[in-house]
């Protein structure tokens, strides 16, 4: 009885730590939009950068074909929507727009 209890405690710790380390090493195999590459607008006007983002509701880019009129190429971009406040904010909601040249169009 004196050896059984410490042995059980050692096995419990080994089981706990091995399962927690395996869970932390495991990579997600697919959630909503993981690893999707999309085009996002940076804070500077006119600059567009590629970045990886996690998807969520509304994260699918719109079909921009025929949305920019005769202007080509018409591409979907993520842009911050700035409220009409005088003081700049640190966070702006984002929305999809269709961009051709320097013009943005509603999708």
From Swiss-Prot:
Give the protein name, as stated in the record.
EPIDERMAL PATTERNING FACTOR-like protein 5
What does the subunit section of this Swiss-Prot or TrEMBL entry state? Interacts with ERECTA.
Q: Where in the cell is it found?
A: Secreted
Species whose genome carries this gene: Arabidopsis thaliana
Give me the disulphide-bonded residues. 64-98, 68-74, 71-100
Q: Where is the signal peptide?
A: 1-22
User: What does the UniProt record say this protein does?
Assistant: Controls stomatal patterning. Mediates differentiation of stomatal lineage cells to pavement cells and stomatal development inhibition. TMM (AC Q9SSD1) functions to dampen or block CLL1 signaling. Acts as a growth-regulatory ligand for ERECTA family receptors. Promotes fruit growth and fertility.
Q: What is its main location?
A: secreted
Return the similarity comment: Belongs to the plant cysteine rich small secretory peptide family. Epidermal patterning factor subfamily.
Mind listing the UniProt keywords for this protein, alphabetically?
Developmental protein, Disulfide bond, Secreted, Signal
* Tissue expression remark: Expressed asymetically in the hypocotyl, on the side proximal to the folded cotyledons at germination. Detected in developing flowers, the chalazal region of ovules and near the root apex, but not in inflorescence stems. Expressed in cotyledons, flowers, adult leaves and fruits.
The alphabetized list of GO BP terms reads: guard cell differentiation; stomatal complex development
Q: Which GO cellular component term is one of those annotated?
A: extracellular region
Does this UniProt record's set of keywords contain Nucleus? no
